[in-house]
Amino acid sequence: MKRSGGPAAPQFPKIREGEICITWIGHASFLLQTHEVNVLIDPIWSKWLKVIKRLKQPGFEIHHLPSIDFVLVTHAHFDHLDRRTLRRVAADQPIVVPMGVGNLVHDLGFRIVHELDYWQTVQLGPLKISLTPCHHWGARFLADLHRDFGGFVIASNGRTIFHCGDTAYFPGFKEIGERFNIEVALLPIGAYEAPTGREVHMNPEEAVTAFLELRAKTLIPMHYGTFRLGFEPLHEPPQRLLASARVHGIEENVLVMTEGRPVVL
């Protein structure tokens, strides 16, 4: 499977009422657009995570972003909460984070910081944003174990997108699927051969199981191929995902995106 990303300016389409446009920037970073608002999730344009080099460039340059209405950050890890990037996109708009993460973003230029507890919902314009639990960890440094972590359900005009954040497989996917009518699930599929040996990331087969338990309609994989966070080959996660999807008869439900290429659903 050949995937390509590059710095060319994306051709963002005109979005009609009822449509949603999804652009994968790379790793866990996404731009979600409706006909009313633009939402940025876990944005990171940095070339380094401390000592870990970015191996694939973002799908487009940060200055090609449209005006951003809301920003969501799933947890405090450096590959999801990048203060340098957040400072560049902050323009006095609201940002939503889990409980305990607000002090990492309050000084970056956001108008208001919404800290959510699990299952809590905030209304931002036409969007309902809900924080869901996951099986991961939230510390940015060794001592700050108080920080929560999770995924976001974004609902607007009958369309519902679930950005899972980082997680291992856990039984909670079934409850998330029961609470929300999820249409599109953005699920992590990389870093499952982690150097630490900790089970905090799903492998591709577990992502398929999670998708089935969520009862979603479309699976978009993420969190692979950008940073070397595990020992698995960079090309392996989507191949294993599609193989597992074929076994379960859901290959047509999997959308492997190309960085920087908008898709309208």
Predicted regions and their residues:
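Pre-active-site segment of Zn-dependent metallo-hydrolases
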Residues: 2-17, 25, 31-76, 83-88, ...
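Metallo-beta-lactamase
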Residues: 2-17, 97-159, 239-265
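Short active-site oxyanion
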Residues: 19-21, 89-95, 159-161
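Catalytic core of the metallo-beta-lactamase
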Residues: 25, 29-33, 123-183, 202-205
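Divalent metal-coordination and catalytic microenvironments
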Residues: 32, 42, 75, 82, ...
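Active-site metal-binding loops of divalent metal-dependent hydrolases
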Residues: 43-46, 75-76, 134-136, 165-167, ...
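Glycine/Thr-rich phosphate-binding loops of Rossmann-like dinucleotide-binding domains
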Residues: 49, 81, 105, 139, ...
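Cap/insert and terminal regions of metallo-dependent hydrolase folds
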Residues: 70, 94-104, 170-258
